[in-house]
Amino acid sequence: MAVVLSERAERVEIGREQQIQPQPRSTGRRASLSSGIGRAARSIGQVFLFAVFGLYGALMSTLVVPVYSVFVRDRVRRAHGIRRLMYHITRTYIGAMRVLRLIDLEVSGIDRVPSPGSLIVANHPSLIDALLLLGHVKDGVVVAKRSLQVNPFTWGGIRGANYVVNADPQSLIDECRARIAAGETLVLFPECTRTADDGVVRLRRGAAHIAVRSRCTLLPVTIEFSEPLLTKNSRWWLAPKVRPSVRVRGHAAIDPGQFLKDDCSVSLAARRLTEHLREFYSDKLKVMEPPRRGPT
């Protein structure tokens, strides 16, 4: 009798343990479902903001810039006004990305440009890099690709703000030197295109030539994403599986004059500065670990 009662007690205890044990498959499915829902929601938000950006660009080209030009005839004053407007719009746009939980953003060191007439250079991993910088650099002048000047959604803002257009290498250097001499702060991506999927930053020498010939202060900025977002070959409508953390950091300013030592030529100094920047980005752009958080 005692043996029978003991066996029954053991069965009851085993049954309780089986009920208490977690169900890993079910939990994994719920986590996967939650992650999928989060990605779908962020993809919808991403498409929505693309539509908003397109509408804003169309309004800038067809309404804002033409009307503003009627009331502000002076070209310099008009450009400053449009650039201030761009500053507030890009801040609002990036703020909307944060509110919609498309990105987590950490910014440091780029809101205090060393002096007027400086050159800000940054790596270019994503389509939103220019927005990230323009939203933190008041009156910044972007060096834009020529294709954006004829794009119906961007030409109004580029022409109204009098941004520099990268058409011809020599004329670009001359134009940038003139802008820097006039006290404008330029924002330039030395890669001239978004970073390739292998993550290697391949710099061209244009930025170095501008800095060396202008003898202007150069502020290097690093832009890092924990997850690929709007990269060179990604689908614009599909958000990453995990919400990206974005880190934008301004580093110690560089004096281009130090690369002109030993009476070297401007071309040699530009090569030295380009190599210095290449090593700088190779060292600073380590793999960014995403923060620990729950499903998104």
PLM ranges: what are they?
Residues 94, 133, 154-155, 176, ...:
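Short amphipathic alpha-helical segments and helix-helix/interface helices
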Residues 2-30, 170-296:
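Non-catalytic C-terminal accessory region of glycerolipid acyltransferases
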Residues 97-98, 158, 179, 211:
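A generic structural signal for well-ordered alpha-helical segments
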Residues 111-112, 149, 225, 254:
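Residue-level detector of flexible, active-site-proximal loop/helix-junction positions
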Residues 99-107, 167-170, 230-233:
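Short gly/ser/thr-rich secondary-structure transition/capping motifs
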Residues 3, 8-118:
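Membrane-anchoring hydrophobic helices of lipid-metabolizing enzymes
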Residues 108, 143-145, 167, 190, ...:
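Thr-Gly-centered strand-to-loop micro-motif
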Residues 65-88, 100, 114-168:
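Catalytic core of membrane glycerolipid acyltransferases/transacylases, capturing the structured
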